[in-house]
């Protein structure tokens, strides 16, 4: 089974719980389509403090490490969030297959 990094908003507009639920739905979508989803943005903030600059940097590093190990990189929703943009750039540099989906899991062009 291929692995896929799920990139979706998490901290945007302080809607963490709503965004977490969306990320779980995106993970289910990936799983139902034959992929093993990786979404560290959902659990790393429970281990490290997102609001401390040094630990937020560690979260970003762990996310990049996860991207490096995944076969593909899927983006859901609006990537305007700064963290998502940086991760997309990193995935591009890693040569990952990148797919963009809207918030309803419809493939975008």
Where do the PLM segments sit?
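Catalytic phosphate/metal-binding cores of nucleic-acid and nucleotide-processing enzymes, i.e., regions
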Residues: 1-109
